[in-house]
């Protein structure tokens, strides 16, 4: 558990809670994680994401949007990490349901599988879907910790370090409580 600016972490990869266009936040000076990561990484990250999405648009159709729960790897560019793994978390519009919880599990699982596939031994997770996407913070933290714990039972030797990065004090308290069970 680490509290602070994820864009300052030296890790194999950091996780970006991306939007479905995967081109970064379009609101100048917005305080979301997507904007923070794209701003710190530099224009090269936005350009790589644009190339990826253009290729997928040619393959799947012009209006292609990245599905919820997938993981896409890019370079870290001006960040101290080697890579950024982008995942689109579920958006909670009304009540939380099992499908949204499974979508969030898929985000964590697919990011971890991406790490294994690409020999990335350390990863820092942001709090996926809890900000602009309105996933309840405590439930999101439970899902994150449970999914990572299940993954480590199967692939523990593949990873050296998994960090849960929080920005707010309230999220730190939630994670400390949940992680004390493991």
What are these regions (language model features)?
Residues 1-182:
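Macrodomain-like recognition of ADP-ribose-binding/processing modules
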């Amino acid at each position: 558990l680490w509290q602070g600016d994820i864009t300052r972490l030296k890790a194999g990869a950091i996780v970006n809670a991306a939007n479905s266009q995967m081109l970064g936040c379009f609101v100048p000076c917005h305080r979301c994680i997507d904007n923070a990561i794209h701003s710190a990484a530099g224009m090269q990250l936005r350009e790589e994401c644009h190339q990826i999405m253009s290729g997928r648009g040619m393959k799947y159709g012009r209006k292609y949007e990245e599905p919820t729960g997938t993981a896409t790897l890019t370079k870290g560019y001006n960040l101290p990490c080697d890579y950024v793994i982008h995942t689109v978390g579920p958006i909670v519009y009304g009540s939380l349901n099992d499908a949204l919880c499974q979508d969030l599990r898929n985000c964590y699982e697919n990011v971890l599988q991406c790490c294994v596939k690409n020999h990335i031994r350390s990863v820092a997770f942001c709090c996926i879907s809890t900000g602009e996407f309105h996933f309840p913070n405590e439930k999101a933290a439970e899902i994150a910790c449970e999914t990572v714990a299940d993954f480590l039972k199967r692939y523990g030797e593949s990873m050296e370090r998994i960090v849960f990065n929080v920005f707010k004090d309230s999220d730190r308290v939630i994670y400390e409580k949940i992680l004390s069970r493991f």
